[in-house]
């Protein structure tokens, strides 16, 4: 039986709306320049996008000459349909692969004889949409696929108090307190503005969602009634180091971007 989050992301109207209206505009996208720079300085590689969704990253992966193939993994067939349509415009070969990041059994067989270095990328806080235990499981699964020449690049949202960028709130909204509180409200508004979610939620639950920043867990949480249907975690550097340690991965580089940490991991 699918989880509440899977129900939302498998909704037929989500894929195209998310790719067109949201994923190109959300604040964390600006920090993907570090991922592009890192990949562009490598030799010939294949890029494996974990949770590729509608394939937004194909817009820049297609421009990197050393990327010889892109394999996008996602569990949502509707999102992969959007990705496949976008891939037709690409020069680079793109393979859309349906698999679950909790298992990756099909994908393991698929890349068994691969000779080129693989760079796994997990963008726009995809890992932060899982629980603590699930994050560890996903990273251990990916580690089990990696050879010494392979790398895993994560983009993880920073805690609000670490974000120095100005957050522009609507004029009618006033908030008392420090910049951290302002950033937290800005974060909630960012998620509140994801109107693409409202239609799927309304059709499934007949209720509008509520958005909440939990200061104890550092999660942005979306509720429908009392049900938690989506979380988006905010990370600290210390937390990232512990997560890598749990998954038995080594941090090659940890870059602090404007809104995100870009973490490069190896075995």
Identify the function of each model-found stretch:
Residues 76-78:
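Conserved SAM/SAH-binding beta-strand->alpha-helix loop
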Residues 54-67:
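Conserved SAM-binding loop of SAM-dependent methyltransferases across substrates and taxa
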Residues 69-74:
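Conserved SAM-binding motif I beta-strand of class I
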Residues 2-34:
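Class I SAM-dependent methyltransferase Rossmann-like catalytic core
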Residues 83-84:
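Conserved SAM-binding loop
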Residues 155-235:
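SAM-dependent methyltransferase
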Residues 90-106:
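Conserved SAM-binding strand-loop segment of SAM-dependent methyltransferases
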Residues 129-141:
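A short, conserved alpha-helix within the catalytic core of class I
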